Swiss-Prot record:
Disulfide bonds join C84-C167. The gene is ADORA3. GO terms for cellular component: dendrite; plasma membrane; synapse. PANTHER family: ADENOSINE RECEPTOR A3, OLFACTORY RECEPTOR AND ADENOSINE RECEPTOR. A lipid is attached at C304 (S-palmitoyl cysteine). InterPro entries: Adeno_A3_rcpt, Adenosn_rcpt, GPCR_Rhodpsn, GPCR_Rhodpsn_7TM. Glycans are attached at N4. Keywords: Cell membrane, Disulfide bond, G-protein coupled receptor, Glycoprotein, Lipoprotein, Membrane, Palmitate, Phosphoprotein, Receptor, Transducer, Transmembrane, Transmembrane helix. This is Adenosine receptor A3. It comes from Oryctolagus cuniculus (Rabbit). One of its GO terms (molecular function) is G protein-coupled adenosine receptor activity. The keyword Chaperone does not apply. SMART domains: 7TM_GPCR_Srsx. The chain crosses the membrane at residues 16-38, 50-73, 86-107, 128-149, 179-199, 233-256, 263-285. GO terms for biological process: regulation of cell communication; regulation of signaling.
Length: 319
């Protein structure tokens, strides 16, 4: 008969797997809906929403690939070292794809309020695709860096326990990589840069609104729309930071040889994955175009009408 500690361990693992499955399904369904909305609504085919499309793709990958892989890794199954390493690297790739997409969105909104008239000449279709490609190339390079030698294989071989290897994330990915390269270099620095950009965006908009109060109503309307959009996208950034920083802090604590309870680690992992299902909710609540298109899709599904000609009229809260 299993003792209480074993029963508790199994209950925690089972709960973790159930939550991962629920979060994964919600992330996939929600972000597929985001892509559907962008495809159907012509007014959303703008630079910012190309990057939101990229973010949604990364979140779909988290739900469809990362969460099943995270469940497999949490079980500590016995597989080859490099098979485990590839799975672990995929977890990292899509995390960094999300933050690179968020950075691209922040830069785009900055250019939108800074350049105004010259914005459309600067953000050409070619440059947009180059920026999207760069986001994913950087994510692949950062995420797959452990495949090029920065991994735990030398440590395992020197400890002579390589033959009975169990696949766990920290058994293949060094904490030095997670803390100094992945977190400090490619998560924390971009987060700080994005915060600085949004602070400057709000500063510019505030000044322009003050100036336009006694001049052109059209200018004031433009900057009020930009303010609403910037607030919504900053909320997306804040949620990303709030969901991912706890796990990064746990990694830092682990690096300095402090013991972290398994349940705390699992909650941190779940919180980071839950971020992938939050963005569609933010868009629905905060961006009018999304809300109206969501409702039209729902109405079309309920009444069995085709929805491929959607063109909802809504207030301009983006370009």
């Amino acid at each position: 008969m299993p003792d209480n500690s074993t029963t508790l361990f199994l209950a925690i693992r089972a709960s973790y797997i159930v939550f991962e499955i629920v979060i994964g399904v919600c992330a996939v369904v929600g972000n597929v809906l985001v892509i559907w909305v962008i495809k159907l609504n012509p007014s959303l085919k703008t630079t910012t929403f190309y990057f939101i499309f990229s973010l949604a793709l990364a979140d779909i990958a988290v739900g469809f690939l990362v969460m099943p892989l995270a469940i497999v890794i949490s079980l500590g199954i016995t597989i080859g070292f490099y098979s485990c390493l590839v799975m672990s690297c995929l977890l990292l790739v899509f995390t960094h794809a999300s933050i690179m997409s968020l950075l691209a969105i922040a830069v785009d909104r900055y250019l939108r309020v800074k350049l105004t008239v010259r914005y459309r000449r600067v953000t050409t279709q070619r440059r947009i695709w180059l920026a999207l490609g760069l986001c994913w190339v950087v994510s692949l390079l950062v995420g797959f860096t452990p495949m090029f030698g920065w991994n735990m294989k030398p440590t395992l071989e020197s400890a002579r326990n390589y033959s009975d290897f169990q696949c766990k994330f920290d058994s293949v990915i060094p904490m030095e990589y997670m803390v100094f390269f992945s977190f400090f270099t490619w998560i924390l620095i971009p987060l700080l840069l994005m915060c600085a950009l949004y602070v400057y965006i709000f500063y510019i908009i505030r000044n322009k609104l003050v100036q336009s109060f006694s001049s052109f109503k059209e200018t004031g309307a433009f900057y009020r729309r930009e303010f609403k959009t910037a607030k919504s996208l900053f909320l997306v950034l804040a949620l990303f930071a709030g969901c991912w920083l706890p796990l990064s802090i746990i990694n830092c604590v682990t690096y300095f040889k402090c013991k972290v309870p398994d349940v705390v680690l699992l909650v941190g992992i779940l919180l980071s994955h839950a971020n992938s299902m939050m963005n569609p909710i933010v868009y629905a609540c905060k961006i009018q175009k999304f809300k109206e298109t969501y409702l039209l899709i729902f109405k079309a599904r309920v009444t069995c009408q085709p929805s491929d000609s959607l063109d909802p009229s809504s207030e301009q809260n983006s370009e």
